[in-house]
Amino acid sequence: QPCLVPDTSPLGQLQGGTNMIVLEGDAVGQIVLRGAGAGAGPTASAVLSDICDIARVYRGTVFGEPAKTLKAATPALSQRPAAYYLRMSLKDKPGALAKVAAVLGEAGVSIDRMRQYGHVNDCAPVLIVTHKTTRADIDHALAAFGATSVVDGDPVALRIEEV
């Protein structure tokens, strides 16, 4: 699922064809693995590695256990609270912003920041950053926006990861 990351985080500072994985653990803190991820060399290396694994009928193990028997103990992404970036176009009507705030409040979503830009064709782009909430609450609000007469088109919602 696409998301936004702070530009001050290791992931936010990536440039070019570099790939990165950020791992966090209680005992070790943050571990960052970074390496080439695009271009002729890295792609050829990955393809060759896959061909070798297929030829060897590789069935890898993790910590001495078959990888397919390991169970993930993490909650579904939709259940992990996070801040969200919302972008929508509001019709130029009295009470439009109040209606948006009411819909978010009814869905259990709290607004951290909001910004409205100049009008274009009787509509104004509005950007909202929420406090931490679940994707289910965001989806509830998005569905409710469709029933209002103040939101023009489909709003966009992107998760903001803290890494």
Where are these regions (language model features)?
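C-terminal substrate-binding/catalytic lobe of Rossmann-fold NAD(P)-dependent oxidoreductases
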Residues: 1-18
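Solvent-exposed residues in well-ordered beta-strands and their adjoining turns
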Residues: 3-5, 24-26, 89-91, 131
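A conserved regulatory-domain signal marking ACT and ACT-like small-molecule sensing domains
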Residues: 46, 51-163
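Glycine-rich, aromatic-lined ligand/substrate-binding cores of catalytic
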Residues: 14-28
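Glycine-rich, flexible loop/turn motifs
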Residues: 10, 29, 73
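A short, polar/proline- and glycine-enriched secondary-structure boundary/capping micro-motif
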Residues: 10-11, 42-46
